[in-house]
Amino acid sequence: MTAREAAYRSLIRIEKEGRYSNLETDVTLRAGELPENEGRLYTRLVYGTIERKLTLDYILAPLCVGIPYPKLDLEVRVILRLSAYQLLYADRIPSSAAVNEGVNLCKRYRKSAASMVNAVLRRLCREKKQIVFPEPEADPVLYLSTFYSVSPELCRLFLSDMGFAECVRMLEAVNAQAGVFTTLRVNTLKLSREEFCKRLEKRGIPFEKTVLSPTGVRLKGNVTRLEELKEGLCFVQDEASQLAV
């Protein structure tokens, strides 16, 4: 199984069955169905697509002609999000590969929509530099929500606590780290974040504590062999999802 197909299947289970993303990715990584070099890409695709969901939906909606985007089958929307994430946020993935793999997934899981998915993704390739977001002066909540993919409720809370400029700086910092680090959520039922960090320090594993989540830690590189992950002492979960729990 490829990282893209595994990511698609996980995203569907998360949406349909309400599975927690950290538990879903943990089960998939433990199953051993992915080659070792695909594990990191799989994790990035799942969490990246979830983390950028609001932005991806905002961008994809006007590109869909005929059937309104919200009325598309869930399977089609997930394929579009997964592919659009690669086109917009994964610089090392060639656009042609993102489009072709998205169409191939659609042929396998929703064959009737393959031509539409192909058209939408190719249009996104052509128009991605012309994407227009809401004006921050006119509607700061809508701008922050769609540009940074944060719920309107959290945007209102952040704005009331720190103001627009500081809110932007914070969200920029969080998003900048998302593609560099793998974010883990410490299982505080078993140990504290401080205890978890001490374990990493003893083995010389570099890490950073998350800025907003009190239970998160960021690590560089492939974490699939991390002892603590295998022991259930932590889960892969992006910081935005940790805040939503």
Give residue spans per PLM region.
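Class I Rossmann-like S-adenosyl-L-methionine
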Residues: 1-225
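SAM-dependent Rossmann-like transferase core, predominantly class I methyltransferases
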Residues: 220-245
